[in-house]
Amino acid sequence: MKKLIYFFVSILMLSCANVEKEASEPAVVKNSESEAISFIIDLKVNPESAEDLDGFIQEITENVLKTEDFCIEYAYYVSEDRTSVTLYEKYIDSESGVKHGQNFMASSFFDRFFNLFTLTKFIVTGPASDDFKKFTSENGFVIEYRNSVDGFVR
């Protein structure tokens, strides 16, 4: 009986160790199986703009963080000479990308954004839906679409 108890305790401990190991390993998802879409937007800073670059970036970033829980990632990357910016955005799916666009265009940030920046390139990666493409086209955005051939996300 004593050996049987030791046996069951040993099995229990080993099974718990495996669960911890499995829980700590991140899941790997192939890019081609993900619904997420990303925006890579190249911008030139308009030198005649009176808008404060750092202040604007902080303000709009805080707004997206507070109001758009469907936004996975949102970041501005500024060149050393502060004349160019790359804006990287990632959304859970195309519908979320449309919702972000609607929110942005209806906000006070829209005019301020285009006063501060000139859009030079707009790339969307991932499975952009026809509805997303229609929405952006109807609103004057010229976009290069790129689909995943291979890759992964942990």
Regions found by a protein language model. Name each.
Residues 112:
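Conserved serine/cysteine hydrolase catalytic core
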Residues 16-85, 92-102, 115-154:
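Short S/T/G/P-rich N-terminal loop/turn motif that feeds into the first structured element of a domain
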Residues 2-7:
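Sec-dependent signal peptide recognition
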